């Protein structure tokens, strides 16, 4: 039965927003419009992943979590810690906005895209993932979707865990959350992860010297947070985390030159906030600072040698957001300010550079009878390209009880990164990349099956491409993306099923050729059940045909990469109420495949872990 009520009573529509690991319709999400609202009131397709899901899947990386979600296509240059890209609904990797606790991820290397192979899985307590345009709420990058990684724990207690696996993988983690009196709580975490890895064998991409070494990964992480409730309505927090990573990879070798095949990444982030949570009005002020230093060097000479490269960026942000309950919905408004500072040499930028952006936005949500309306508008003032406006609107109609039709349209954009603007081949006159998106969807609850099917189109213009003749970047590319997405979840006795299907036709609108590294079709299936206190899980993923470039010879040739079916098997057993042991086999049938041409994947891998809570 569908309940209709205002946001004052936290309305929920049980049949809607089907595909989510946390399937409760009353689940609150914060990413859609920056304040908590029931997931069922978000018209855009939204997925929520909890820490319990991550533990059940026994994921050892953020990429392993995201690859299971609808519309997501992950490519990686090998195994743990190797360079990776996220494609959502066929858009570029730079068209995905990644937030950490609602704050934009600091992008070392000013590449303009997030490499989540470096972000520690130990910090991830929850993931909220929204598909479709969201620039009208968040500004640049939110063309394909938004991934918000939340580090705040929900429950107090202490957990000690350890794990071991293939390729000499080992992981040790301890975390605790404790109450200090009635109004204060503190959270601490420390994590160590290491793997010897394997030889990713970047065939043809390493120049004249073969590199038959293991490409390992090491990560050390610290996290701390202090939260305090001043009154029932006022609260504040201070939070900080940092990680120190080292990655070995196969680099391009030129005779007589150092071999830069080691990456060292230092990253730290700090934020503090003050929140007011009244019955009708909510407000929050958050400030943050992050600093990343990304070295690539030859270990024979060290990271401070003149042959090494350093990408260094500092990011400062201030967010002021407000939300007011109005009728059967709400109105929100806020201001974002951001400053990014680079050092000379970062991203091949000869001089250090500051870029500032101020955004003002307005959001609205209202329920009128059988209809739900959502809209947002934003204007950004950027120190490089000036002003840019975006907007989006959606409407949902419950035409039969338990069934809803949704139509939406939105504009979004991607600002040029600093390397494209001021690098050796840069062009300071670049404009933002622009997107116009349409989507129509049906969703409902039929015979216990919670389902959604949608079709979408995304036209992207002013794409920034490199011109081989002028050796400069220009706004000259166009893309046309059409897709269909279907999701469902249901129970059959003790079995829980979650399934999704994606069809994406992503093409260069000028040449009508497929965009590289995007699978045309994907099928994802998760089966979970409990038998004699054992928790079992089977994951299936089909990756369809994709295209890539062979960079081993010039001119570069386009190559076709066939599809593959992958299976994972995971099991967990609670030895006591405090101690749980887990085991997993990834790539159960040891399939040989690549997501980036020339870079091998790991093959079959085993992990064994245990956790003790008190």
Swiss-Prot record:
<feature type="transmembrane region" description="Beta stranded">
    <location>
        <begin position="535"/>
        <end position="550"/>
    </location>
</feature>
<keyword id="KW-0472">Membrane</keyword>
<dbReference type="GO" id="GO:0046872">
    <property type="term" value="F:metal ion binding"/>
</dbReference>
<feature type="transmembrane region" description="Beta stranded">
    <location>
        <begin position="184"/>
        <end position="195"/>
    </location>
</feature>
<comment type="similarity">
    <text>Belongs to the TonB-dependent receptor family. BtuB (TC 1.B.14.3.1) subfamily.</text>
</comment>
<feature type="transmembrane region" description="Beta stranded">
    <location>
        <begin position="328"/>
        <end position="337"/>
    </location>
</feature>
<keyword id="KW-0106">Calcium</keyword>
<feature type="transmembrane region" description="Beta stranded">
    <location>
        <begin position="263"/>
        <end position="277"/>
    </location>
</feature>
<dbReference type="InterPro" id="IPR010101">
    <property type="entry name" value="B12_transptr_BtuB"/>
</dbReference>
<keyword id="KW-0626">Porin</keyword>
<comment type="function">
    <text>Involved in the active translocation of vitamin B12 (cyanocobalamin) across the outer membrane to the periplasmic space. It derives its energy for transport by interacting with the trans-periplasmic membrane protein TonB.</text>
</comment>
<dbReference type="Pfam" id="PF07715">
    <property type="entry name" value="Plug"/>
</dbReference>
<dbReference type="GO" id="GO:0015420">
    <property type="term" value="F:ABC-type vitamin B12 transporter activity"/>
</dbReference>
<dbReference type="GO" id="GO:0046930">
    <property type="term" value="C:pore complex"/>
</dbReference>
<feature type="binding site">
    <location>
        <begin position="110"/>
        <end position="111"/>
    </location>
    <ligand>
        <name>cyanocob(III)alamin</name>
    </ligand>
</feature>
<keyword id="KW-0732">Signal</keyword>
<feature type="domain" description="TBDR beta-barrel">
    <location>
        <begin position="155"/>
        <end position="614"/>
    </location>
</feature>
<dbReference type="InterPro" id="IPR000531">
    <property type="entry name" value="TonB-dep_rcpt_b-brl"/>
</dbReference>
<keyword id="KW-0798">TonB box</keyword>
<keyword id="KW-0479">Metal-binding</keyword>
<keyword id="KW-0812">Transmembrane</keyword>
<feature type="short sequence motif" description="TonB C-terminal box">
    <location>
        <begin position="597"/>
        <end position="614"/>
    </location>
</feature>
<feature type="transmembrane region" description="Beta stranded">
    <location>
        <begin position="473"/>
        <end position="490"/>
    </location>
</feature>
<feature type="transmembrane region" description="Beta stranded">
    <location>
        <begin position="517"/>
        <end position="529"/>
    </location>
</feature>
<feature type="binding site">
    <location>
        <position position="251"/>
    </location>
    <ligand>
        <name>cyanocob(III)alamin</name>
    </ligand>
</feature>
<feature type="transmembrane region" description="Beta stranded">
    <location>
        <begin position="371"/>
        <end position="381"/>
    </location>
</feature>
<dbReference type="InterPro" id="IPR010916">
    <property type="entry name" value="TonB_box_CS"/>
</dbReference>
<feature type="binding site">
    <location>
        <position position="85"/>
    </location>
    <ligand>
        <name>cyanocob(III)alamin</name>
    </ligand>
</feature>
<keyword id="KW-0998">Cell outer membrane</keyword>
<feature type="binding site">
    <location>
        <position position="261"/>
    </location>
    <ligand>
        <name>Ca(2+) 2</name>
    </ligand>
</feature>
<feature type="transmembrane region" description="Beta stranded">
    <location>
        <begin position="353"/>
        <end position="369"/>
    </location>
</feature>
<dbReference type="GO" id="GO:0006811">
    <property type="term" value="P:monoatomic ion transport"/>
</dbReference>
<keyword id="KW-0406">Ion transport</keyword>
<feature type="binding site">
    <location>
        <position position="213"/>
    </location>
    <ligand>
        <name>Ca(2+) 1</name>
    </ligand>
</feature>
<feature type="binding site">
    <location>
        <position position="517"/>
    </location>
    <ligand>
        <name>cyanocob(III)alamin</name>
    </ligand>
</feature>
<feature type="transmembrane region" description="Beta stranded">
    <location>
        <begin position="158"/>
        <end position="165"/>
    </location>
</feature>
<dbReference type="GO" id="GO:0009279">
    <property type="term" value="C:cell outer membrane"/>
</dbReference>
<feature type="transmembrane region" description="Beta stranded">
    <location>
        <begin position="232"/>
        <end position="248"/>
    </location>
</feature>
<dbReference type="InterPro" id="IPR037066">
    <property type="entry name" value="Plug_dom_sf"/>
</dbReference>
<feature type="binding site">
    <location>
        <position position="215"/>
    </location>
    <ligand>
        <name>Ca(2+) 1</name>
    </ligand>
</feature>
<feature type="transmembrane region" description="Beta stranded">
    <location>
        <begin position="602"/>
        <end position="614"/>
    </location>
</feature>
<feature type="transmembrane region" description="Beta stranded">
    <location>
        <begin position="434"/>
        <end position="443"/>
    </location>
</feature>
